[in-house]
């Protein structure tokens, strides 16, 4: 059961981000390789050292946020269909990772990150606790904040949302980022 929860937590965290895109009526097929690029960056740039996590994780977040923003920009501003843009980004990221790694596996993760998957609090793995906290935060953002209402408005009818004063392009870019 522990393994099921750990695997579910990882997929659940990714699904939280995907939820924002789907609510706007979009789709993001690049999420798997976006996650893989992030994992590669953390494992190789941090060099298995907890001390390097201070800059490694923020750098990974900036890079993946930027790649997601590129998806969102091309979809909302350049009007590239979401399935085409995100599938194209998926292929680009896959090729980039194969070129960077030359087909060899990356380094091991820093001990602090390994702790997230191996240790627990009151029998609940740390990663599952993080997933629960992130789920609560996303649910609050969706149902108690303006941002969530904007996402739902765009998903229902982007044209009406635009005429009602919502900056549709910016909101879509942010949802993909």
Mark where each language-model region is:
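Hydrophobic alpha-helical elements at and bordering transmembrane segments
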Residues: 5, 9, 45, 92, ...
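Single transmembrane alpha-helix segments in multi-pass membrane proteins
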Residues: 1-49, 73-79
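Alpha-helical transmembrane segments within multi-pass membrane transporters and channels
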Residues: 50-90
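Membrane-embedded alpha-helical core segments of multi-pass
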Residues: 9, 13-17, 38, 63-70, ...
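Internal alpha-helical transmembrane segments of multi-pass membrane proteins, especially GPCRs
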Residues: 6, 10, 34, 58-59, ...
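Transmembrane helix-bundle core of multi-pass membrane transporters
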Residues: 1, 78, 82-145, 171-174
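Helix-loop-helix "hairpin" substructures at the membrane interface of multi-pass membrane proteins
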Residues: 54-60, 66-71, 122-177
């Amino acid at each position: 059961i522990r393994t099921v929860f750990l695997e579910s937590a990882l997929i659940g965290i990714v699904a939280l981000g995907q939820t924002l895109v789907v609510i706007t009526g979009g789709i993001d097929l690049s999420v798997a390789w976006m996650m893989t690029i992030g994992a590669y960056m953390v494992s190789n740039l941090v060099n298995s050292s907890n001390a390097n996590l201070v800059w490694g994780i923020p750098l990974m977040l900036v890079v993946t946020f930027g790649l997601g923003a590129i998806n969102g920009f091309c979809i909302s501003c350049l009007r590239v269909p979401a399935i085409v843009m995100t599938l194209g980004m998926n292929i680009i990221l896959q090729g980039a990772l194969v070129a960077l790694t030359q087909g060899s596996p990356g380094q091991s993760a820093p001990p602090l990150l390994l702790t997230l998957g191996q240790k627990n609090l009151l029998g609940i793995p740390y990663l599952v606790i993080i997933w629960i906290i992130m789920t609560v935060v996303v649910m609050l953002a969706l149902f108690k904040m303006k941002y969530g209402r904007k996402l739902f408005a765009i998903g229902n009818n982007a044209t009406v949302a635009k005429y009602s004063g919502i900056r549709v392009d910016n909101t879509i870019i942010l949802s993909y980022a």
